[in-house]
């Protein structure tokens, strides 16, 4: 029992997941917005009419996310699955980055307290919080030269929401740049394998949807609100976001912080160049900010050793002083 109480499970996972569960219990009656629509589409995907799931151009979710929603179905249960799942993924990613128990506990509780886990359910778009965390994990694997696994994970993130493909720049963190192409190929195959069945067996109209530029966005300052914004412009938006991420990846590849700065760059450019603006878009930046803060705080003792050892050093100096002269 004593060993268990000293373990990271008892010191980190239990309190964070308990806090997330407590928040989820309060959210059971919350209206989760688009999540209701996604659940219905998920139920269709798991039915005999699965081939027509993406016949509605409005549906921009990935098939893996729909499978999860359709399988669980119950919104109260989804509150627990999504909120605890988001908290657990954050702790897992921080653990892979070598963050200690104390900082992981603080980051996990901050995620619950700041609303990251709660809004992952209540806003109805949990992928906004989950996808960037998967990118960070893929970046860690890419730095370890595990490009196949990294490409696979990025492809899986696109199965939640298609913009997950934008995580490709983290593949440039591999020690051998030529292998980044292998990871990108794996990512492409995974994405294609998820979407092809719907295109071959039914009507795949996801790419027929057009957005309209809204006021309050950067694009709204350049073009008139209401201007159509279709998939060709989405590809331009994606290219700019991924290009910026690639620049950060190649110029900062030696820094540990690159594993979250590349995803953050992509996320921020994606949001700033988007034709519409929703509050849940910023969940991605919040998740990455928690990862970055934990890494920065972990480095502080090594960067400022005097601050860490100041009191002890002062004690040693006083102890080393010569004794007073007695008359």
Predicted regions and their residues:
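Long, contiguous secondary-structure blocks with strong helical propensity
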Residues: 94, 145-147
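Membrane-interface alpha helices of multi-pass inner-membrane proteins
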Residues: 135-139, 147-172, 265-271
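Long, intrinsically disordered low-complexity regulatory regions of metazoan
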Residues: 325-326
């Amino acid at each position: 029992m004593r060993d268990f109480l000293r373990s990271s499970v008892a010191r980190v996972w239990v309190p964070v997941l308990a806090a997330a569960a407590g928040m989820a219990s309060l959210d059971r009656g919350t209206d989760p917005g688009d999540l209701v629509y996604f659940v219905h589409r998920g139920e269709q995907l798991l039915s005999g009419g699965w081939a027509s799931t993406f016949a509605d151009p409005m549906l921009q979710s990935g098939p893996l996310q729909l499978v999860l929603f359709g399988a669980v179905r119950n919104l109260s249960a989804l509150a627990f699955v999504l909120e605890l799942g988001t908290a657990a993924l954050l702790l897992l990613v921080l653990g892979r980055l070598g963050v200690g128990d104390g900082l992981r506990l603080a980051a996990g509780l901050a995620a619950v307290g700041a609303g990251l886990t709660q809004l992952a359910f209540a806003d109805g778009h949990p992928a906004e919080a989950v996808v960037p965390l998967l990118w960070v994990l893929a970046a860690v694997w890419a730095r370890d030269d595990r490009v196949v696994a990294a490409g696979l994970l990025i492809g899986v993130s696109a199965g939640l929401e298609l913009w997950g493909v934008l995580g490709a720049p983290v593949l440039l963190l591999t020690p051998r740049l030529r292998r980044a192409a292998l990871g990108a190929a794996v990512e492409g195959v995974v994405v294609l394998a998820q979407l092809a069945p719907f295109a071959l067996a039914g009507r795949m109209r996801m790419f027929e949807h057009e957005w309209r530029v809204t006021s309050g966005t950067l694009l709204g300052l350049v073009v008139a609100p209401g201007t159509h914004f279709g998939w060709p412009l989405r590809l331009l938006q994606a290219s700019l976001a991924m290009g910026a991420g690639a620049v950060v990846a190649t110029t900062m590849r030696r820094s540990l912080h690159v594993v979250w700065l590349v995803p953050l760059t992509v996320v921020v450019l994606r949001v700033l160049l988007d034709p519409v603006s929703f509050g849940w878009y910023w969940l991605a930046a919040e998740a990455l900010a928690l990862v970055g803060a934990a890494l920065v705080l972990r480095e502080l003792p090594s960067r400022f050793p005097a601050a860490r050892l100041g009191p002890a050093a002062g004690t040693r100096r006083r102890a080393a002083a010569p004794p007073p002269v007695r008359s």
